[in-house]
Amino acid sequence: MSDSANSSCIIIAIAGASASGKSLIASTVHRELRDQVGSDDISIISEDCYYKDQSHLDFATRTQTNYDHPNSMDRDLLLEHLRALKAGKSVDIPQYSYVEHTRMKEVTHFTPKKVIILEGILLLTDERVRNELSLSLFVDAPLDICFIRRLKRDMEERGRSLESVIEQYRKTVRPMFLQFIEPSKQYADIIIPRGGKNRIAINMLKAQILHLLGRK
C-alpha cells in the first residue's frame, strides 16, 4: 500500500498468473459494490489494454510477441493515465486485439471514478505503478489449474490451436511467471489463495475498499 495514494481516487491492483482468477475477483467485487459505492463510481481497467502498439511490425513478427515480459507493456502510458485519473481528468484507454497482435483504432473514454480496479499479470513488477496504488493483491493459484483455464479460454475465445497454446505456455508463459510475476508477489498487501472463488477473500477486499472510502 502506497503512502502516496490519493484518497479521492482509490486504485486497487489485482495481479497474479494468467488465468489465476484475477478477472473473476475484479468483476465480482465490481458487481457487488456498485450499489454501495455507486454504479458510476467503480470500474475496472485491464492491464491488457496497455500492451504496446505493434502496428509498425509485420504480422509474422507480431505473432511472436512475448506478452508475459514486462517490456511488452506501455508502462509510461499506464502511469500517465493513472496519474491523470487521480487528478480528476478523463483518459482514452487503448484497446488491444489478440487476433491482430496490436492496438485497435478504437479507444475507450474513461472518466475518473472513486474506485478503480486494475487487473493484470505484471502490475506489481513496476515500482512506479506500485507507488500509485491504494491497495495491491496477488491471486495465488496452482500453475496447473491456471494452464487448464488458459488452454480452454484461448481455444474457445481467441481461436487458438491446442499446439500453439501449449508452445506459448512452455516458451514464455511459465518461464516469465517464474522470473517476473511470482517474485512480484512480495509486493502485494494481500495474497489471495485458491483463485477467484475465494469468498472470504472477496468479502475482505470489499470491506477494505469500503474502509478506504470511509464507509462501514
Curated annotation (Swiss-Prot):
A Gene Ontology molecular function term of the record: cytidine kinase activity
Binding site for ATP: G16, A17, S18, A19, S20, G21, K22, S23
Domain of life assignment: Bacteria
Keywords linked to the UniProt accession: ATP-binding, Cytoplasm, Kinase, Nucleotide-binding, Transferase
GO annotation, cellular component aspect: cytoplasm
SUPFAM superfamilies associated with the record: P-loop containing nucleoside triphosphate hydrolases
Pathway linked to the protein: Pyrimidine metabolism; CTP biosynthesis via salvage pathway; CTP from cytidine: step 1/3; Pyrimidine metabolism; UMP biosynthesis via salvage pathway; UMP from uridine: step 1/1
Example GO biological process: UMP salvage
Catalytic reactions of this protein: uridine + ATP = UMP + ADP + H(+); cytidine + ATP = CMP + ADP + H(+)
Stored InterPro entries: P-loop_NTPase, PRK/URK, Uridine_kinase, Uridine_kinase-like
Keyword Transferase in record: yes
EC id: 2.7.1.48
Cellular localisation: Cytoplasm
Classification via PANTHER family: URIDINE KINASE
Family membership: Belongs to the uridine kinase family.
Protein name (database record): Uridine kinase
Natural source organism: Mannheimia succiniciproducens (strain KCTC 0769BP / MBEL55E)
Gene that encodes it: udk
